[in-house]
Curated annotation (Swiss-Prot):
Residues 5-162 form the NAC domain. It is found in: Nucleus. The keyword DNA-binding applies. Pfam families: NAM (PF02365). Coiled coil: none annotated. This is NAC domain-containing protein 90. The NAC domain includes a DNA-binding domain and a dimerization domain. It comes from the Eukaryota.
Length: 235
């Protein structure tokens, strides 16, 4: 009975909720079976993307668009090596620019990186429709006046399939989206610089080092921040 899915259940977390609640509780050892029935612990890089929907959280297994996982740090990474992003049929490769995740009060709470799955061997693999957002939380034990550090014990990964239409992640109930837009429009951010440094990062990648300069501008009357990424190094 405990594993039965509630009729009508939909999991539509915001990025802030993923980092500040779900990932934070997992890192602090406060997660339980009920949370893991939604977001299980799994090294997604050891599983073929097409198999991930079958091993997703019991309460989200019927979702045809997106799946969430807590991914533990690999042993090779803990020993100072680069984590593997290769499966039997292909590999995950970072794409685009990594970026910060902010809370509603404009506090940096984590970082997000996007990856795409390619079949075959690097660097000549064939791009697929499988994508992933990987989230890391900021280490809150570090003095706030110092350069933010990312915690590595676990990351939270959202795996999804690109369909050409708006992503499921952006199709939360209208009430939720309207509230977020109102909150976003109320935030006025002055020019800010921050840097995120941590130990080794991956994806067929090397060490992570983000140096970001952020400007808030308004374009076409929309209260959306535009980001100027400078000296960014996160392969």
């Amino acid at each position: 009975m405990a594993d039965e899915v509630t009729i009508g259940f939909r999991f539509y977390p915001t990025e802030e909720e993923l980092v500040s609640f779900y990932l934070r509780n997992q890192l602090e050892g406060r997660s339980d079976d009920s949370m893991h029935r939604v977001i299980p612990v799994l090294d997604v890089f050891e599983v073929e993307p097409s198999h991930l929907p079958n091993v997703a959280g019991v309460r989200c297994r019927g979702d045809a668009e997106q799946w969430f996982f807590f991914v533990p740090r690999q042993e090779r990474e803990a020993r100072g090596g680069r984590p593997s992003r290769t499966t039997g049929s292909g590999y995950w490769k970072a794409t685009g620019s990594p970026g910060p995740v902010f809370s509603k009060d404009n506090k940096m709470i984590g970082a997000k990186k996007t990856m795409v799955f390619y079949t075959g061997k690097a660097p000549t693999g064939r791009k697929t429709k499988w994508k992933m957002n990987e989230y890391h939380a900021v280490d809150e034990t570090v003095n706030a006046s110092t350069i933010p550090k990312l915690r590595r014990e676990f990351s939270l990964c959202r795996v999804y399939i690109t369909t050409g239409s708006s992503r499921a992640f952006d199709r939360r109930p209208e009430g939720v989206l309207q509230t977020e837009r109102m909150l976003t429009s109320d935030v006025a951010v002055a020019e800010t610089s921050f840097r995120v440094e941590s130990s080794l990062e991956t994806s067929i990648s090397g060490g992570e080092h983000i140096d970001v300069s952020m400007n808030t501008e308004f374009v076409d009357g929309l209260s959306e921040p535009m980001w100027d990424w400078e000296q960014l190094t996160w392969p």
